[in-house]
From Swiss-Prot:
The gene is plsC. One of its GO terms (biological process) is CDP-diacylglycerol biosynthetic process. Its EC number is 2.3.1.51. It is a peripheral membrane protein. This is 1-acyl-sn-glycerol-3-phosphate acyltransferase.
Length: 255
């Protein structure tokens, strides 16, 4: 067995704990359905931490979230399905996610109850109603997170950001928070193994549970005022450049 892999027993233990977590969560999904924002935020934080704990995944916050009011559009780079749980564990919000996730067992229902907006990434007709829905959510004081790359990458760099959904922040007069996500192995080097870019969910999950140690680092990079941007393209460029600088910082030591 390769020295950088978890034992078979450890892999099975992690999968069993995740299964138990899914079962328990599936019975208590109403905890994030309705209610006051504070109670739902607490439930979302617990969900995020629960998944990471079940899989023995460490979580570090490099640059902490700045003080700001609610109703923030959060933009992050996209590496893995774990991104949502890592972000939820430290900064609860609703998400904009691909339509396929809605049909996933338990996770799809969790997303619906947490206010996730599901989109068809191949349909431009979805953009206007989604921007309107996100704008209304932001104006109600609820945070919304999304991944402007629109698909997962290796995590060692960025794919070009899409500008369309930044319009919702401009329409709502909201702040935009840039978040950089990086994944590290047991040696402290960057790793692309948790990436969901070129494999299905079962293979991705097996890669994750097979790692001796996995740590996700979350950096809250900067806050931009959408009202001060010339248009959604200028806003997109500012957020993309700030995230790219952090993601590229130590990518040269990746394994």
């Amino acid at each position: 067995m390769s020295s950088n892999k978890a034992s078979f027993f450890t892999r099975l233990r992690r999968l069993c704990r995740l299964t138990v977590w899914l079962f328990k969560t599936g019975k208590n999904l109403r905890g994030i359905d309705g209610g006051c924002p504070e109670s739902r935020n607490r439930a979302v934080i617990e969900l995020g931490r629960g998944v990471l704990a079940a899989l023995d995944i460490g979580l570090e916050v490099g640059r902490p979230a700045p003080e700001h009011p609610n109703g923030v559009l959060v933009a992050a780079n996209h590496v893995s399905w774990l991104d949502i749980f890592a972000m939820s564990a430290v900064y609860p919000s609703s998400f904009i996610a691909k339509q396929e996730i809605k049909s996933w067992p338990v996770l799809g229902k969790m997303g619906q109850n947490a206010g996730t907006v599901f989109i068809n990434r191949n349909s431009r007709r979805d953009i206007e109603p989604i921007n309107r829905a996100v704008c209304e959510t932001l104006q109600r004081g609820q945070n919304v997170s999304f991944f402007p790359e629109a698909r997962t990458s290796s995590g060692l760099g960025l794919l070009p950001f899409k500008a369309a959904l930044f319009q919702s922040a401009i329409d709502a007069g909201a702040k935009v928070l840039a978040v950089a996500l990086r994944y590290y192995d047991e040696t402290g080097k960057r790793t692309a193994r948790p990436s969901y870019a070129d494999v299905g969910l079962p293979t991705c999950l097996w890669r994750i549970v097979s790692m001796k140690k996995l740590t996700i680092k979350v950096d809250f990079v900067c806050v931009a005022d959408a009202a001060e941007s010339e248009d959604r393209y200028a806003l997109k460029d500012k957020i993309e450049e700030s995230i790219r600088a952090v993601v590229a910082d130590d990518a040269d030591i990746a394994v």
